[in-house]
């Protein structure tokens, strides 16, 4: 499970992610992406380990990408509790994303003041360098709130984080390998 805070006004993202492995091992880590400085911090608080990297590009936008198509319009509920949504699809290319090729879908609740993401999926290929891996991912959004109650929780970088970029080949063995995870340079997924 993951929780996310987007602060588009300050150009930053906070992510709290749990990774569950088939052998029962679980890891939790945080990611802070700050596009004003062009940096990303990956933080394993349990180990007091932090890696500094360049923020993934392109910078996220708070809009529906131009290369999407509405595939379906639907609703949930009825009467005064009815919620209308649109389901979009888009093709992703390795040239555009840097490491993904395939088709993404996402649904957005149409609101009077805000459009709110509802779900997303991707079916295609993830490239680690030139090595391709089949990838299928799905996600859903819930408990969405407008505003960030505690920005420090999401965006404060711990004192033990390095000032210089981290050499990812030198990560200690007790730190789980997270670099294969597509950390967001997202548009809604």
UniProtKB/Swiss-Prot annotation:
GO biological processes: cell-matrix adhesion; flagellated sperm motility
Protein name: Development-specific protein LVN1.2
Domain of life: Eukaryota
Alphabetized PANTHER family for the sequence: MAMMALIAN EPENDYMIN-RELATED PROTEIN 1
Tissues and organs where the protein is expressed, per its UniProt entry: Endoderm cells.
Organism: Lytechinus variegatus (Green sea urchin)
Cleaved signal peptide residues: none
GO cellular component term, pick one: cytoplasm
UniProt KW keywords: Developmental protein
MF (Gene Ontology): calcium ion binding
This protein's record includes keyword tRNA processing: no
Matches recorded under InterPro entries: Ependymin (IPR001299)
Keyword Transmembrane: no
